[in-house]
Amino acid sequence: MNMSNMAIDLVGVRKSFGDKVIVNDLSFSVARGECFGLLGPNGAGKSTIARMLLGMIWPDRGKITVLDEPVPSRARARRGVGVVPQFDNLEPEFTVRENLLVFGRYFGMSARTIEAVVPSLLEFARLESKADVRVSLLGGGMKRRLTLARALINDPHLLVMDEPTTGLDPHARHLIWERLRALLARGKTILLTTHFMEEAERLCDPLCVLESGCKIAEGEPDALIDEHIGCNVIEIYGGDLDQLRELIRPYARHIEVSGETLFCYARCPDEISVHLRGRTGLRVLQRPPNLEDVFLRLTGREMEK
């Protein structure tokens, strides 16, 4: 059978629970070998999309294809998919090695085959020294790396990762990112749901920005930032925001207010700084634009964590 270049294809997918629409007429495609991000706040529909891709729930309408198989009617596609859920579901009283051995049996792998791949998975997850340690004694970062290694037990073509670094400290998060880059270098395809802007910028090729189940933007991170922002950002805290807005309006491309912060987008930020000079009680931060600014620009509010 000829394989298409697309690992995932969604067309016009909608999902509701009761009267609440969770995913609304969503379409996107994920090419083989890329990391595609679903970026949005809690409640945007990211986890629901992941569950539909895995055949765990059915869409109300629309078409989903995973690895050239229609989902959920053809469960065969599931064999080529590894899953890293949002919350760890490891066996806490089993050792690291035992968790891998048991999980491999769910895929019908022989004991000999599983035992042959476990050493390389432990090395990949940097858990060789913890192989015989009970999972309940591991830290959060190690548990996430074990969950990632477990998802690779059957050498899947596609990884579906739902908020893989939520709750991790910065060091553990960066280590997961480094392992994901290694998988992409091997040609794996990754679907990544996240609300971390930095994570999306660092890992994703294209990404889809979601708000209340709707796609509000799609593209590569740098392209989205350039399209919707395209200039430096000045954050201003303190003072009378209405007064500040009027003061800097002539020198700004665009101004947003979120909470007690004024976001000013300007090609020449020095002009803004000159007019703020001498004003007391202000904290001013000048920085390059990021995906948080894109979300704020499109929705009028900051990303909720």
UniProtKB/Swiss-Prot annotation:
Membrane topology recorded in Swiss-Prot or TrEMBL: Peripheral membrane protein
GO cellular component: plasma membrane
Places the protein is found: Cell inner membrane
Ranges of residues in domain ABC transporter: 8-237
Keywords for the protein's UniProt record, in alphabetical order: ATP-binding, Cell inner membrane, Cell membrane, Membrane, Nodulation, Nucleotide-binding, Translocase, Transport
Pfam family membership, one: ABC_tran
Superkingdom of the source species: Bacteria
Keyword Transmembrane tagged: no
Class of the enzyme per the UniProt entry, highest EC level: translocase
Enzyme Commission designation: 7.6.2.-
Residue positions binding ATP: 40-47
Broad class of the protein's primary localization: membrane
Gene Ontology MF term list: ATP binding; ATP hydrolysis activity; transmembrane transporter activity
InterPro entries linked to this entry: AAA+_ATPase, ABC_transporter-like_ATP-bd, ABC_transporter_ATP-binding, ABC_transptNodI, P-loop_NTPase
NCBIfam families tied to this protein: nodI (TIGR01288), PRK13536.1 (NF010059)
Record function comment: Part of the ABC transporter complex NodIJ involved in the export of the nodulation factors (Nod factors), the bacterial signal molecules that induce symbiosis and subsequent nodulation induction. Nod factors are LCO (lipo-chitin oligosaccharide), a modified beta-1,4-linked N-acetylglucosamine oligosaccharide. This subunit is responsible for energy coupling to the transport system.
Family indicated by similarity: Belongs to the ABC transporter superfamily. Lipooligosaccharide exporter (TC 3.A.1.102) family.
Oligomeric and partner information: The complex is composed of two ATP-binding proteins (NodI) and two transmembrane proteins (NodJ).
Protein name: Nod factor export ATP-binding protein I
Gene name of the record: nodI
